[in-house]
């Protein structure tokens, strides 16, 4: 019945490797400095990982440093206040809501907005549980639009 999440089985698998690859010449400190520098330029954690992969040949920061990109950013005080995946869902909901205001009879978009907002609520519950979001944080569409406008 629930086919929405049953699709999309094709993906790459990370190699099971404990240490850093042989071709990476950067040290642990240099990689941490690169992560910090890219974060100060305004890149998100996922974009930092993509830049390190494509431009510096670092397949996975955790293999070299022993910490994830977000852990490095949290230590340096550069981590985003709202986790990146939640923020991307909020941005998507704002865009769909803007579309619905322009085309109010678009029932498919309304259904999509309901699904996006339910994902936001589930993810919010998870992040409150692990302590990444304060307990009083609530998703509000009006505030979300201001949040997305301020981040752009």
From Swiss-Prot:
The keyword Nucleus is assigned to this record: no
Keyword tRNA-binding: no
Any one Pfam family match given in the protein's UniProt record, by short name: Ribosomal_S13_N
Matches recorded under InterPro entries: Ribosomal_uS15, Ribosomal_uS15_arc_euk, Ribosomal_uS15_N, uS15_NS1_RNA-bd_sf
Annotated keywords: Ribonucleoprotein, Ribosomal protein
Record GO terms (molecular function): small ribosomal subunit rRNA binding; structural constituent of ribosome
GO cellular component: cytosolic small ribosomal subunit
Coiled coil: none
GO biological process: translation
Transmembrane domains' residue ranges: none
Family: Belongs to the universal ribosomal protein uS15 family.
Assembly behavior: Part of the 30S ribosomal subunit.
Protein name as annotated: Small ribosomal subunit protein uS15
């Amino acid at each position: 019945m629930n086919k929405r999440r049953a699709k999309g089985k094709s993906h790459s698998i990370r190699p099971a490797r404990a240490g850093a690859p042989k071709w990476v010449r950067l040290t642990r400190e240099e990689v941490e400095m690169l992560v910090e520098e890219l974060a100060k330029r305004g890149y998100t954690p996922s974009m930092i990982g993509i830049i390190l992969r494509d431009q510096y040949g670092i397949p996975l920061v955790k293999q070299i440093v022993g910490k994830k990109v977000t852990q490095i950013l949290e230590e340096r005080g550069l981590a985003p206040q709202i986790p990146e995946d939640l923020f991307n869902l909020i941005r998507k909901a704002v865009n769909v809501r803007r579309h619905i205001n322009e085309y109010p009879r678009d029932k498919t978009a309304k259904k999509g907005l309901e699904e996006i907002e339910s994902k936001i609520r589930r993810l919010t519950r998870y992040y409150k549980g692990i302590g990444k979001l304060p307990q009083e944080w609530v998703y509000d569409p009006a505030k979300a639009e201001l949040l997305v406008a301020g981040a752009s």
